[in-house]
Regions:
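Glycine-rich, positively charged N-terminal anion/phosphate-binding segment
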Residues: 6-20, 35-110
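N-terminal small/glycine-rich loop or linker at the start of catalytic domains
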Residues: 19-31, 65-85, 118, 122-126, ...
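Active-site beta-loop-alpha junctions enriched in small/polar residues
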Residues: 35, 60-62, 90-92, 117-119, ...
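Hydrophobic faces of well-ordered beta-strands that scaffold small-molecule active sites
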Residues: 30-34, 55-57, 85-89, 112, ...
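Glycine-rich, flexible loop/turn motifs
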Residues: 15-22, 26, 55-56, 61-62, ...
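Alpha/beta enzyme core
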Residues: 49, 95-128, 132, 136-215, ...
Length: 344
């Protein structure tokens, strides 16, 4: 049975009109977050195919990009199937960030996104990511350099600030707009929170009030109602979903449907899930090669099947073979068994 419509939905729909990022139009602003080790080309294409308005690459280190590190170049690979898409860059030197942006523009990126939100210690220790929120002069220099370096629209992702005493996202938003940034995304936590506590969607409204740029809210959107509440509290123009897509590449589309109608769109049935899992697995093998692709796939298989009957035994089998044909056999055997149980 479908859920009753939510009274607030018409107000939200008036804000979920297409957003303009320079010359790029995003029809419905439900976005896939840049997630290290997750937002690779196979996953982005899958999420885009399910209806996400815009997808972003995992974070790419600007210096490694310039040195054409093999792994980094693979991370920066794009496909027309995922357009429009953004390549996210991290770094601390304006000149290197500008050069990396030019390289990605030449390789097919639609948008360049600048990371000033990553809380990871190794990134912060290199004075990149959210560390730049402690040095707005340096942050502004990076924004200026990247905007001037490419003809593509440039966007910025940040946190609310470094810590509770320094929530300076509104100030950085103003600097970004002056630099020519075309869209902002704000994760509703400080760097010092990491992923603890709850994202402060209400504070994001202060960032929205500080700028005329399209603003996307991010953090803790794991069910459809979260997106609605986030938009109500933040006043944002859209939402960006990260961990909520683990094992659910269709979730952004469910969010879009809920915001349009106030009703829940059911997830895929077992046959569609089998097709999705096996197709995603094959795409990872093609992208990474059989050895790395098989290894990378295991976390996704775990997320896809979490909560399904006898999934622990199935996952154990998948995790203990490196033979793609055997993995496909296990997929077929497991989902065929579930389909037969469902039909009984």
């Amino acid at each position: 049975m479908s859920s009753p419509a939510i009274e607030a939905v018409p107000d939200i729909l008036s804000r979920l009109k297409p957003i303009q990022i320079g010359p790029v139009t995003v029809d419905e602003a439900v976005l896939l977050a840049p997630m290290s080790g997750i937002s690779d080309l196979p996953f982005r294409k899958l999420v885009k195919g399910y209806g996400a308005g815009l997808v972003m690459s995992e974070m790419i280190a600007s210096q490694a990009m310039i040195y054409q590190n093999k792994r980094t170049m693979q991370m920066a690979t794009t496909s027309e199937d995922e357009y429009p898409m953004a390549v996210q860059l991290a770094g601390t030197e304006p000149e290197l960030m500008a050069e990396a942006a030019r390289l990605n523009a030449d390789r097919g990126a639609t948008i360049i996104d600048i990371n000033m939100g990553c809380p990871a210690r190794k990134v912060v220790n290199g004075y990149a990511g959210s560390a730049l929120m402690k040095d707005l002069k340096k942050a502004g220099a990076i924004l200026d350099a990247v905007v001037k370096a490419v003809d593509l629209p440039v966007t910025l992702k940040m946190r609310t600030g470094w810590d509770d005493d320094n929530r300076n996202a509104p100030e950085l938003a103003h600097i970004a707009e002056e630099s020519g940034i075309q869209m902002l995304t704000v994760h509703g936590r400080t760097r010092c929170q990491m992923y603890r506590g709850k994202a402060d969607w209400r504070f994001i409204r202060t960032v929205k009030d500080a700028t005329s740029l399209p603003l996307i809210a991010n953090g803790d959107i794991v069910v459809e109602e979260d997106a609605l509440e986030c938009l109500n509290q933040s006043g944002a123009d859209g939402v960006m979903i990260g961990r909520g897509t683990y094992g659910r590449p269709w979730f952004p589309n469910q969010v879009k449907h809920f915001l349009r109608t106030g009703e829940h769109l059911p997830g895929p049935g077992l046959q569609e899930m089998y097709d999705t899992v096996s197709g995603h697995y094959e795409a990872m093998l093609e992208h990474y090669g059989p050895v790395i692709g098989n290894r990378v796939s295991r976390k996704h298989v775990g997320w896809y099947t979490k909560g399904l009957p006898d999934s622990a035994v199935f996952r154990n089998g998948v995790n203990n073979t490196n033979n793609p044909k055997e993995v496909h056999r296990l997929f077929h055997e497991y989902f065929q068994g579930l389909l037969e149980q469902e039909a009984a």
